[in-house]
Amino acid sequence: MANMIDKIDLKSQGSSNLSGEMTNHQKVGTLYKRLLLQVKHLWHFLLLAAIGSIFFSAADASMIYLINPILNYGFGPGGGITKQSATILMLMGVGMVGLLALRSVGSFVSQYFIGSLGQKVVYKFRKDIYKRLMDLPASFFDKHSTGQIISRLLYNVDQVIEATSTAIITVVQDGTFVIGLIVVMFVSSWQLSLFLIVVGPFLGLFISIINKKFRNLSRNTQSSMGNVTHTAEETIRNYKEIRIFGAQQKQQNKFFKNLDYTYSQQIRTIALDALTSPVIQIIASLVLAFSLFTIAIFGTNEGDGSSWLTAGSFASFFAAAAAILKPIKNLTKVNVVIQKAVAATEDIFYILDYPAEKETGSKELAKVDGNVTIKDLSFAFGEHKVLSGVSVDIKAGQTVAFVGKSGSGKTTLTSIISRFYTQHEGEILLDGVDTRELTLENLRSHLSIVSQNVHLFDDTVYNNIAFGLSREVSEEEVIDALKRANAYEFVQELSDGINTNIGNNGSKLSGGQRQRISIARALLKNAPVLIFDEATSALDNESERVVQQALESLTKSCTTIVIAHRLSTVENADKIVVMDGGRVVESGKHQELLEQGGLYTRLYQSGLQ
């Protein structure tokens, strides 16, 4: 049997789940316990569902047992119906109606409360995961793709609902039914029932073998589903680039490869699942056949020919024995669901247990002038040194442009200023206070970011501009920000003005329009420090001119740190910091640096692109 199961190949083809491999049974047990703790506070739902299941199963088992008295006492000698037997039959009929009513009530109660329990657990998981994602550090999102994370939030949680609803109701309802049927069999004939005990060890051995197989298959399937989701999300997001560069076939092959692996794992799960029930039924059938041979050989006592097995007890015993196969089959099938849930739960708890963004500060600054001082800053991604000994002094109200080749550390520096990463050495001071001493919320309340890749939300213009502000924002304030960002003219032309939905990431707007909405958002926040990762190189001349005017409006009232790509920005900056290999190699005003004839001069001559 084990060899038969081992033929179902479980080898992973490079897929990896978020949390890594389960290493031992203790870890599996811990996951089970943690999953059960999620329903601990809903014990009354579980109790009511269990009571309903007991009523349901007890009614089913009792109806099967009624075969015994009906056959033994419901008919007279020779199989006819007498007055006495007719009374018994009528009583049995009334009893069956009562049992069916009890069964119906039990079925409703168990399914309703178990279903509600499952939905409550999934609701809680999705809320907890989403809340946790809001607190996770940038390193988490660097390690895991968007598709993988979304798959955990949606697909994995769906697997848990199967364990907390379908699986639990199957275990409770079919489990109590099996117990009830065993009782019926022992009451009908304890001698025959003893033969059924031999099936236990065989079933236990079989189930223990397939448990590990199911768990590995489930883990591989969930991991590959994350890859499928990621590739699909990547394709949808970058559909223009894929078509422009003629990469449809390449991207399709990548998606199909992930899909093929997911399909193969699911087919292996189906094969293993399909193998389980027939084997169990064969074992049970052999036991039943053995019981029939026993009856034929030992069914009568010596001497008077009387039997220890009546027609009624024989019929009720075998009715129960036949009926027990289906719930046993259901119980073995639920193992597939439970193993999927365990694998899914592992990744869910990995996210929930992942260390949150480190909060090192406790101070809060009510008002900030915007003085930013960077002292001997160093940072590395693993073994790769990105910044080394960077020192820059930025006065309040200044516009400082950072220039340098790609990979020189400019963007990383701005991520450290906003504490998405924490420096390994050195310090960054905001108005003389180390940013690590400030709470994350307080520090970021003094910062605005206009990123190179503008990120807008599938919402209205108004909500995108007022995004993140805790106070009520009037339409007049939003319109004022739009005017200062040179965006109000085109917004007025939209179908619903500032209440127009702009689509996924502002897909209904042009590049320049999206840029100006982002600038209007920063204007409304009115933070004393602006981090601007310039992207005007992607715009046409007219859009660039309009955006540049909007930027001038924005930078008048704050300290501006610019990752510069355009000559116009560099020329107008109060200070230019030239970076190379993670170090500051030159610093000064535009004309001063040109006269030095160094790296800045070469970058300037090449257009700074």
UniProtKB/Swiss-Prot annotation:
Domain ABC transporter: 372-606
Subcellular location per the Swiss-Prot or TrEMBL entry: Cell inner membrane
GO cellular component, one term: plasma membrane
Domain (ABC transmembrane type-1) ranges: 47-340
The name this protein goes by in its record: ATP-dependent lipid A-core flippase
Predominant place of localization: membrane
Gene: msbA
Transmembrane spans: 47-67, 88-108, 167-187, 190-210, 279-299, 305-325
Membrane topology (UniProt): Multi-pass membrane protein
Family that this chain belongs to: Belongs to the ABC transporter superfamily. Lipid exporter (TC 3.A.1.106) family.
Pfam families reported in the protein's UniProt record: ABC_membrane (PF00664), ABC_tran (PF00005)
GO molecular function: ABC-type transporter activity; ATP binding; ATP hydrolysis activity; ATPase-coupled lipid transmembrane transporter activity
Binding site for ATP: G404, K405, S406, G407, S408, G409, K410, T411
Domain notes per entry: In MsbA the ATP-binding domain (NBD) and the transmembrane domain (TMD) are fused.
Record key words, sorted: ATP-binding, Cell inner membrane, Cell membrane, Lipid transport, Membrane, Nucleotide-binding, Translocase, Transmembrane, Transmembrane helix, Transport
Catalysed reactions, semicolon-separated: ATP + H2O + lipid A-core oligosaccharideSide 1 = ADP + phosphate + lipid A-core oligosaccharideSide 2
Subunit description: Homodimer.
Function: Involved in lipopolysaccharide (LPS) biosynthesis. Translocates lipid A-core from the inner to the outer leaflet of the inner membrane. Transmembrane domains (TMD) form a pore in the inner membrane and the ATP-binding domain (NBD) is responsible for energy generation.
Enzyme Commission code: 7.5.2.6
